[in-house]
Amino acid sequence: MAVEMFYDDDADLSIIQGRKVAVIGYGSQGHAHSLSLRDSGVEVRVGLAEGSKSRPKAEEAGLTVGTPAEVSAWADVIMLLAPDTAQASIFTNDIEPNLKDGDALFFGHGLNIHFGLIKPPANVTIGMVAPKGPGHLVRRQFVDGKGVPALIAIDQDPKGEGQALALSYAKGIGGTRAGVIKTTFKEETETDLFGEQAVLCGGTEELVKTGFEVMVEAGYAPEMAYFEVLHELKLIVDLMYEGGIARMNYSVSDTAEFGGYLSGPRVIDAGTKERMKEILKDIQDGTFVKRLVANVEGGNKELEGLRKQNAEHPIEVTGAKLRGLMSWVDRPITETA
């Protein structure tokens, strides 16, 4: 099914320029949205809790900062870019009491709306503007006069202005320069979660760890295993990112290409596909989100346990040591080895 695309000529920037926008959060996406909207002539305020470490950064950038409640009361368009697990409480405590007839509440991801964790009043426009790239790229492309493709969706539209407003907002952060795709909260949420769990985060992580274990258990040095299954992964992903799977296969050796064709289906087989379908079903029917909410309500104990277990895997010890030899790699603050 063909998607509906929009570009600069399809969006009226004056719509968002005539509104007052509150951006809740100043992380990766929050800083890109706030600064780019401001540079597009939009009146913007940033909502951050008292004592937030991001407050000085936003203020140094010349942005007006208030608490989430303060900026929500001031604004008529609110973009909620706090972490998924914090959004429901921010909505209940800070946003909902300050919503007025005709306001718009936008999101960068649809989870809380799609799964009913946030239930907004009927007189508020509910929409999504979601750039398909990290915030630093969104901002850099905007400054360079370009843009990152974005998604828009409208879930609730009491005044019939939602799509025009979302397109205007997307233009304000550079999205329509590249192209904006119209989707739904359901489609964006379920595809995003599936991609993260089955392929990008969960699937890739387990593939790498298992490959490392197989090599080390067969007697190969952990350092050699690390280079082959993790370090070189970036080279392959970069090729796929730039030109698809065909570009990757064109760029690697014939030996690597031929071996990949033969062995790839032995690793990812019909059974894997069936299990991926089960993961998708758990996402669609809300099983995953129920567990996510239970984890948060339980003080993140399950998540912390999984993090600890993951951090203790031998590949992490080996990787920390080897990355210390790589002057071109920015080592994260979690590594002290």
Curated annotation (Swiss-Prot):
Amino-acid positions noted as binding Mg(2+) 2 in the UniProt annotation, renumbered to this chain: 192, 228, 232
Organism domain of life: Bacteria
SUPFAM superfamilies according to UniProt: 6-phosphogluconate dehydrogenase C-terminal domain-like, NAD(P)-binding Rossmann-fold domains
Cofactor: Mg(2+)
Active site location: 109
UniProt keyword annotations, A-Z: Amino-acid biosynthesis, Branched-chain amino acid biosynthesis, Magnesium, Metal-binding, NADP, Oxidoreductase
Molecular function GO labels: ketol-acid reductoisomerase activity; magnesium ion binding; NADP binding
Binding site for substrate: 253
InterPro entries reported in the protein's UniProt record: 6-PGluconate_DH-like_C_sf, KARI, KARI_C, KARI_N, KARI_prok, NAD(P)-bd_dom_sf
GO cellular component, one term: cytosol
Record GO biological process: isoleucine biosynthetic process; L-valine biosynthetic process
Annotated NADP(+) binding sites: 26-29, 52, 54, 84-87, 135
Residues annotated as binding Mg(2+) 1: 192, 196
Uppermost EC category: oxidoreductase
Catalytic reactions of this protein: (2R)-2,3-dihydroxy-3-methylbutanoate + NADP(+) = (2S)-2-acetolactate + NADPH + H(+); (2R,3R)-2,3-dihydroxy-3-methylpentanoate + NADP(+) = (S)-2-ethyl-2-hydroxy-3-oxobutanoate + NADPH + H(+)
EC number(s) from the headed UniProt entry: 1.1.1.86
Domain KARI C-terminal knotted: 184-329
Task performed by this protein: Involved in the biosynthesis of branched-chain amino acids (BCAA). Catalyzes an alkyl-migration followed by a ketol-acid reduction of (S)-2-acetolactate (S2AL) to yield (R)-2,3-dihydroxy-isovalerate. In the isomerase reaction, S2AL is rearranged via a Mg-dependent methyl migration to produce 3-hydroxy-3-methyl-2-ketobutyrate (HMKB). In the reductase reaction, this 2-ketoacid undergoes a metal-dependent reduction by NADPH to yield (R)-2,3-dihydroxy-isovalerate.
Name the record gives this protein: Ketol-acid reductoisomerase (NADP(+))
Biological source species: Nocardia farcinica (strain IFM 10152)
